[in-house]
Amino acid sequence: MVQRLTEFDTIAAISTPLGEGGISIVRVSGEDAVAIVNRLFKGKDLEKVPSHTINYGHIVDPATGQVIDEVMASVMLAPKTFTKEDIVEINCHGGIVVTNDILQLLLANGARMADPGEFTKRAFVNGRIDLTQAESVMDIIRAKTDKARQVAVKQLSGGLLTEIRALRQEILDVLANVEVNIDYPEYDEEEVTAQKLLACAEAVSGKIDRLLETAQEGQILRNGLKTAIVGRPNVGKSSLLNYLTQSDKAIVTDVAGTTRDTLEEFVSVKGVPLELIDTAGIHHTEDQVEKIGVERSKKAIAQADLILLLLDGSQELTEEDRQLLELTAGKKRIIVLNKTDLGQKLTAAEIAKESGSEVISTSIMMKENLDELEALIKKLFFKGIENSNDQVLVTNQRQAGLLAKAKQQLADVASGLEAGMPVDLVQIDFTGAWESLGEITGDSAPDELINDLFSQFCLGK
């Protein structure tokens, strides 16, 4: 478990993306944050200003007296800050040179360059947030839809933390009772204690199940669905990509083989984030460039969470169509019967019967039934959970894996009791479940896990 400490060196980093813009923010956190910035700041004495104030002045190189930039310095004193340390944020003009010059001056005057995610790590170590809230910080930054942002904000406010700590408390209450009975066996009725253990294990396991039921939806909102748009050449793949992205990223022509590679784009479809991959048409070709595109398309199909398979409804099924139906069998897919405006030689009913998949008839060029296609994508992966703003979702594999581990440990408790094992032996798995749940929030997480998690954060956060 990571020790709760407040004695760190002072760190600095640029918190805004590098490049030209209105402003850049350089963040400084630590015991000497105010003193270090004050050495460079010409204006009010920052060591005497009230907390949570914004102060106008200039950053000046103390070695040369050169003015670097006109800035606003926000002073926030511990403990009412993100890291629970003293923080100064320097708002300077946006630009690579000026921002880096200010950072280098801070480093030359006593600050250390922050590691990726170190500000958030300090917030965790100092007890400001738990691990689920730390993860939600990056989820907010990376959110690709409004719903993903809402879920991340809910988690940042402690939604999952509250649920997990309540489960741990249920286990702890029973563990305390077991410990007393082990210490004072003359007062123990082992059958009664075993019944309490079993009842608690079943109750907590049921609540874990309800959380795990949200894991698919939560991880889709967080990571998006890899969605491959496939079909033989010139059936409308690029037209569908352009409709969903509202762009002309893919070249649309009547020439087969126009898309020679895979094109990727992130879009929100009814609140579901899709990583759309427009694949090259899969067909026999002697063109070496097209061959590479076809192989990449097959790889994209293998890795996809969802397949949008386009067929030309104005023509009979070709051998290439049948190969694609076979290649995508077993994957979650929607068959899009395109070009209904040209007359139909294929019907949705017969394709659905032959393929066992959902089928939508449409004319992408005429924008017919495309809203129904979007609704079907949402229906395939969501069960109404995403419509509730109050629902707590499990949003990543780490959380889901630890919940599953705790559930298995509780199942071992139940099977052990049913097999007649002594309570003090069964208690080991019961304590294990309590610790597994604690790893989710960081209450009992090993240092290696903590360091690995925060290393994935961006610099300056």
Swiss-Prot record:
Name listed for the protein in its UniProt record: tRNA modification GTPase MnmE
CDD domains: trmE (cd04164), TrmE_N (cd14858)
EC class of the enzyme, as a word: hydrolase
Domain of life: Bacteria
Gene designation: mnmE
GO molecular function annotations of the record: GTP binding; GTPase activity; metal ion binding
Binding site for GTP: 234-239, 253-259, 278-281
Positions contributing to K(+) binding: N234, T253, V255, T258
HAMAP family the record matches: GTPase_MnmE
Cofactor binding note from Swiss-Prot or TrEMBL: Binds 1 potassium ion per subunit.
TrmE-type G domain location: 224-382
Any Pfam family matching the protein: TrmE_N
Subunit (UniProt): Homodimer. Heterotetramer of two MnmE and two MnmG subunits.
Enzyme Commission identifier(s): 3.6.-.-
Requisite cofactors: K(+)
SUPFAM superfamilies registered for this protein in UniProt: P-loop containing nucleoside triphosphate hydrolases
Signal peptide annotation: none
